[in-house]
Amino acid sequence: MIYAAPGAVGAPVAFKSRYDNFIGGQFVAPLDGQYFDVITPISGKVYTQAARSTEADINLALDAAHAAKDAWGATAPAERAGVLLKIADRLEQNLEKLAYAETVDNGKPIRETLNADIP
């Protein structure tokens, strides 16, 4: 199958123009407000921007993880398993989109990403 280029009509994934950090269950801008261009090796063009995280951003993420660990640890194993299985189901439902995004990011042929990297 032939896939449309990032940003083109018919592309399996519509990339946002900018991605923030995901900390404490929400997307947050980097504290310094800086982003970097993400270039696809397929065309050499910028297809999105990503947060340029600093030590301060990492510390926020670590603080959020430490704050969440006690509640997660107190959750019954069966409930934790259910959450993880739901995540696995969502991944399986979106394998082609994930493979496309990975191919755009690393430049590998889509068949390799679909058959080796993502499953």
Predicted regions, residues:
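Terminal low-complexity tails and localization/encapsulation signals of metabolic enzymes
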Residues: 1-49, 82, 86
